C-alpha cells in the first residue's frame, strides 16, 4: 500500500468510528480481536450517539466524498436490502461538489481533442454549467456549424480515486461478510461488486455517448422521448460533446403547469416509455432520476421527455422479460402459486425451494395490497416486495433486475408526482398482454420459424447425409447392444449355475455332518460330505469373472 492509500484508509476508519457505524454490527458476530482493536482506538469515539443509524450512515458517506455519496445513492435504491427508513435517509445524499479549475478543464479537453479548444469551438464558457463527482459540464458553440453544444469532461485523477476507494470498500465488505456469515441477507461483497461495475461504466464517457446514440436511434420517430445528438467524432473516453437542449426540469411542476403542459398525458407517456424500452427494445435508461429528465417547452399539449446521462443502461434476457411480464400478470390475477413457480423456473431461486412455503410467503406480502384500489398499486413496490420475499429464500441477486426495479420506482414516483391519479395498471396492462401474445402466440411461433429459415436452408443439402449417418450409427448401436446383451445373458447363466452348485454343496455338507453326529451309516454321511465338497470345487471354479457392460 502507498502512503496515500494508508492515509485514505485511516480517514475512512476514523469517519466510520466517529459516526458509530461499528455499533451497527451485531455484537454476537463480532470477534474478540475486533473488539480489542476497537478498544485500542479509544480516541475515535462515536460523536453522534443522538442520531439514528440511517442518518449516521448518510452523514458518514457525505463526509467521505463523491465515491461514497454515489454508493449511498445506489444503496438507497436497494430496498430489498434496506428498510424504508434507511433507504429514505440515503436518498437525501446530494452529488454536488465544487467545480475544479477551468484551466485544468481546458487542459483535459485539449488533451482529448489533441488540439486547442479554439480549433473546434467558439465561445467556450470557463464557468461550468454543472459540476458533479465524476465530471463537469461546460458550454460552447461548434465552430463548424454554429450549433450550441455542451462538453462533459471527467474530473482530474478521478479514475485513480475511484479505484482506490472501491478497493477499500471491497476489503471492508469482505471483512463484514466474514463476520455475518455466507448466508447473511445483506451480502455486502456482492453489493460492492455491483457498484464497482456501475461506477466503472460511468468513468468511460465514450460508452455513455454510444449508449445515447443507440437510445436516440430507438426513439427517432417517437413523440415521447428525445435524446440529444452526440457528436461522435468529438467523443472520447474522458470527453463527450453533445447538442445543448432547452427544457423544463421534470421536477419543476410549477413551471410545467405555468406553460400549460398536459400532465396526465406526460405521466402516461412516462410509463409507456419504460415498458417500451424494456420489452420492445431491451435497452433501458437505468438512471432516470429527476436531474436527468427534462420536458420540452414547445407543444405543451403534446409534451415529450428529454433524456440525459446515458452512463447507466440496463438490458434483460428474453427469459427475464417473459418471466417479468408473467409475474405482473400473475400478481394482478392474484395467482401466487404461479409467481412462486416463475421464480423457480427462472433460476432466480433454487430449484429445491419449498414452493408451497414460497407461495404462502408471497401471498402474505401481496394480498394486503389489494385492500387499496388498483390505480394506487405501485408496480415498483410489487417488484420490491417480491424481491424482499425471494431474498428470504436465498434469491440469487440479479443486477439487471435491481436496475429495473430502481428505474420503475423512479418512473412511478415521477408519474404520480406529475399526475397523482395515474393508473399504472390500466396504462401498462394492454402493453404487457400484447407483448405476451407476441411472444407465445401463433405470431411468435411464425416469427421464430421465419428467423430460423436461413439456418435450415443452409443445412438442408447436408440433411440426407446426416440422416444416413444417424441411421448407420443406429444400426451399429443396435449390433453393439445385441452383443452386450448376449454376453450379459451368458454371464448370468454361468452365475446361476455356480450359485446352484455352491448352494447344493453347502446343503450336502450340512446333511452329512448331521448324519455323522447321529451315528448313522458312515458311508452315507461321508458320501454326502464328499459329494458336497466336490460340488463346491466345481461351483467355485465355474464362477464367472466380473465384467463391466
Swiss-Prot record:
InterPro entries: ABC1_dom (IPR004147), Kinase-like_dom_sf (IPR011009), UbiB (IPR010232), UbiB_bact (IPR045308), UbiB_kinase (IPR050154). GO terms for cellular component: plasma membrane. ATP binds at residues 129-137, 152. Its EC number is 2.7.-.-. Its main location: membrane. The active site is at residue 287. It is a multi-pass membrane protein. It is found in: Cell inner membrane. Pathway: Cofactor biosynthesis; ubiquinone biosynthesis [regulation]. Residues 123-501 form the Protein kinase domain. GO terms for biological process: regulation of ubiquinone biosynthetic process; ubiquinone biosynthetic process. Disulfide bonds: none annotated. One of its GO terms (molecular function) is ATP binding. The chain crosses the membrane at residues 498-518, 520-540. It comes from the Bacteria. Keywords: ATP-binding, Cell inner membrane, Cell membrane, Kinase, Membrane, Nucleotide-binding, Transferase, Transmembrane, Transmembrane helix, Ubiquinone biosynthesis. Is probably a protein kinase regulator of UbiI activity which is involved in aerobic coenzyme Q (ubiquinone) biosynthesis. Belongs to the ABC1 family. UbiB subfamily. This is Probable protein kinase UbiB.
